[in-house]
């Protein structure tokens, strides 16, 4: 039996090779996986033209996944540096990479990225439109916007962020409700500008059915972008954000009618106590579609440390049911991330994702922690290093500050609780003052 997309296959009772791979990775019964995909609760972004892809699932009951942003900008157009970031992201087991290139002809970089990446690839096609056509934003036509999306599909992109929820109605809500930081979504701000300059409806909303046909043709997952996400604590969970979310819920149903897989994008900046409510709202208004959040950042005061503000919010969000975290680096709000910034961002996001998985009871999530605890109890340093989320850093710290005795560290020395409890439990003496046992 033939199928067009992963969702179409799931609804027809067909088990695809991508489903088989995800089922084994997640230790989820394949029929449960298929049923959730048929309902839109799980997606497997897998463009038919992405031949090097090692597929991953995103959604209900699965491990929380992370995405790494990279790409070329006008001020930092170094392609080789960005390709090095791709290699690091893959080595560090990020499940997704988004090419957010915003300068020049990005096609060659995007094609290299797809060809070399086992991780799923996402893009924001509107970023590419100005460079692709070599036109000012206001001069790009509705058809040209759609053609850029088609080009990304041809190139093998697995999921595309489309800010289709920013329409004339949500713009009215935005204009009525004063914000501190207006529209902070780059794609959202470009679309808003295009709409205002041309006095027209958002082309991705007006021609949404045509957009869905493009996505279905390549089995591109549509990541419905939140153009009106809050960019400051003051704007969190405001009328504009929720108005757009309601539209995204309607667009989700329309995509599912065409068997197009959907991810919903979310905040952004918000207070800790608002995170759970935002997850509940998304799951309710968007009918259980997987939720993909940028952070959320839980305070605005920490430039240089936003990988921490994001990890705090990300862990809480994941614990309440968020399915996909976009990493944030220490460079957020300051500059294009360096390789080191990127590494720190990936690790912070992976910690947040795993902490969330522990809290929401993802199958097998606690096995990693149990192995680490047992290694600590045995003072098996090599095992601890091998289990560390960043084994290189753990080894380096141990090497830089070596203890007198191997069965301790320089924090506690011979007062190490693990060391002394092991000895007492084995019926041995505890020696703290003497230099030798």
From Swiss-Prot:
<dbReference type="GO" id="GO:0051539">
    <property type="term" value="F:4 iron, 4 sulfur cluster binding"/>
</dbReference>
<feature type="binding site">
    <location>
        <position position="163"/>
    </location>
    <ligand>
        <name>substrate</name>
    </ligand>
</feature>
<feature type="binding site">
    <location>
        <position position="416"/>
    </location>
    <ligand>
        <name>[4Fe-4S] cluster</name>
    </ligand>
</feature>
<dbReference type="Pfam" id="PF01964">
    <property type="entry name" value="ThiC_Rad_SAM"/>
</dbReference>
<feature type="binding site">
    <location>
        <position position="69"/>
    </location>
    <ligand>
        <name>substrate</name>
    </ligand>
</feature>
<feature type="binding site">
    <location>
        <begin position="185"/>
        <end position="187"/>
    </location>
    <ligand>
        <name>substrate</name>
    </ligand>
</feature>
<feature type="binding site">
    <location>
        <position position="292"/>
    </location>
    <ligand>
        <name>substrate</name>
    </ligand>
</feature>
<protein>
    <recommendedName>
        <fullName>Phosphomethylpyrimidine synthase</fullName>
        <ecNumber>4.1.99.17</ecNumber>
    </recommendedName>
</protein>
<dbReference type="GO" id="GO:0016830">
    <property type="term" value="F:carbon-carbon lyase activity"/>
</dbReference>
<comment type="similarity">
    <text>Belongs to the ThiC family.</text>
</comment>
<dbReference type="InterPro" id="IPR038521">
    <property type="entry name" value="ThiC/Bza_core_dom"/>
</dbReference>
<dbReference type="InterPro" id="IPR037509">
    <property type="entry name" value="ThiC"/>
</dbReference>
<dbReference type="GO" id="GO:0005829">
    <property type="term" value="C:cytosol"/>
</dbReference>
<dbReference type="InterPro" id="IPR002817">
    <property type="entry name" value="ThiC/BzaA/B"/>
</dbReference>
<keyword id="KW-0479">Metal-binding</keyword>
<keyword id="KW-0408">Iron</keyword>
<keyword id="KW-0862">Zinc</keyword>
<comment type="function">
    <text>Catalyzes the synthesis of the hydroxymethylpyrimidine phosphate (HMP-P) moiety of thiamine from aminoimidazole ribotide (AIR) in a radical S-adenosyl-L-methionine (SAM)-dependent reaction.</text>
</comment>
<dbReference type="GO" id="GO:0009229">
    <property type="term" value="P:thiamine diphosphate biosynthetic process"/>
</dbReference>
<feature type="binding site">
    <location>
        <position position="412"/>
    </location>
    <ligand>
        <name>[4Fe-4S] cluster</name>
    </ligand>
</feature>
<keyword id="KW-0411">Iron-sulfur</keyword>
<feature type="binding site">
    <location>
        <position position="127"/>
    </location>
    <ligand>
        <name>substrate</name>
    </ligand>
</feature>
<keyword id="KW-0949">S-adenosyl-L-methionine</keyword>
<keyword id="KW-0004">4Fe-4S</keyword>
<dbReference type="GO" id="GO:0008270">
    <property type="term" value="F:zinc ion binding"/>
</dbReference>
<keyword id="KW-0784">Thiamine biosynthesis</keyword>
<dbReference type="GO" id="GO:0009228">
    <property type="term" value="P:thiamine biosynthetic process"/>
</dbReference>
<comment type="pathway">
    <text>Cofactor biosynthesis; thiamine diphosphate biosynthesis.</text>
</comment>
<feature type="binding site">
    <location>
        <position position="269"/>
    </location>
    <ligand>
        <name>Zn(2+)</name>
    </ligand>
</feature>
<feature type="binding site">
    <location>
        <position position="409"/>
    </location>
    <ligand>
        <name>[4Fe-4S] cluster</name>
    </ligand>
</feature>
<feature type="binding site">
    <location>
        <begin position="226"/>
        <end position="229"/>
    </location>
    <ligand>
        <name>substrate</name>
    </ligand>
</feature>
<feature type="binding site">
    <location>
        <position position="333"/>
    </location>
    <ligand>
        <name>Zn(2+)</name>
    </ligand>
</feature>
<keyword id="KW-0456">Lyase</keyword>
<feature type="binding site">
    <location>
        <position position="98"/>
    </location>
    <ligand>
        <name>substrate</name>
    </ligand>
</feature>
<feature type="binding site">
    <location>
        <position position="265"/>
    </location>
    <ligand>
        <name>substrate</name>
    </ligand>
</feature>
